[in-house]
Amino acid sequence: MKPLLLYLPLFALLFSGCCAKSKQELVACGEDKVFILDFESSTEGQPNIIWSWAASEATDLPDVYRTKYLIPFDECKPVDSSTKILLTSSGGGIVLLDRATKKSLFYAYCPMAHSAEMLPNNRIAVANSTHPEGNSLEIYDIDTPEKVIFKDSLYSGHGVVWMYKHKLLFALGFDDLRAYSLKNWDSDSPELALERKWLIPSEGGHDLTRISDNELIVTAHENSWVFSIADETFSVFEPLANVHNVKSINYNPLTGQLVYTKAETNWWTNNIYCENPEKVLHFPEIKLYKTRLSQ
């Protein structure tokens, strides 16, 4: 028994390491800044920022990105197990940023970009809002910066989410929600094929978020709704019923955890609102726009 007893501390260490709960992180952006907080240890009086980056640090990009295209940030999606952050800006830029090195892995000029999503085959979908060159849904290849490989019209594009189970890309515009399939995706000339389109219950579509394999949350000027893909129906998202101008939303239907931002001063806010657990994270020096949860 003695040899076995010698290994017990090692077994315990390995077991505890395997079973340790990963820390929940919160990515937020506004103005020319993006930062990551440790969610559990952040309080209203002292948000615990563990990582940050600013457009001025993008020295590996053309100067116009640092001074114009990346100001202000309006999307900050953690992707690839949170090793990268997909950023968009209404100033006209998109960047895929490596978290560890803070190097740009992809960039493009996207007029009034408001959201983006990773797609199969190392491609990116971008929703562009109101701009003479915008109002569109664009597709890019990560290996080819600043080259649009497909484009469709989408008035006031604000959200894009890839639903893997359904093999559909959902896109949110001013007053409609669309579902696209991937066409000729393994070729050099990929396309999106519009499969379905639904009018949303209120104008001013803003955020689009996946909450399960079969459901999305849509936010707009007047309210937020859960969209059932199977039933093709919208139902009011009760935790935020009648809350106007929700700019970003994160929700776990299993735990009830809810994290969101809403416009409180023009289009921006100084607060991130959290429920289950309940707290308000306050940032008096930053005009915040969106926040995204990651593990």
Regions found by a protein language model. Give the residues of each.
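Blade-loop segments of beta-propeller domains
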Residues: 53-84, 89-92, 100-115
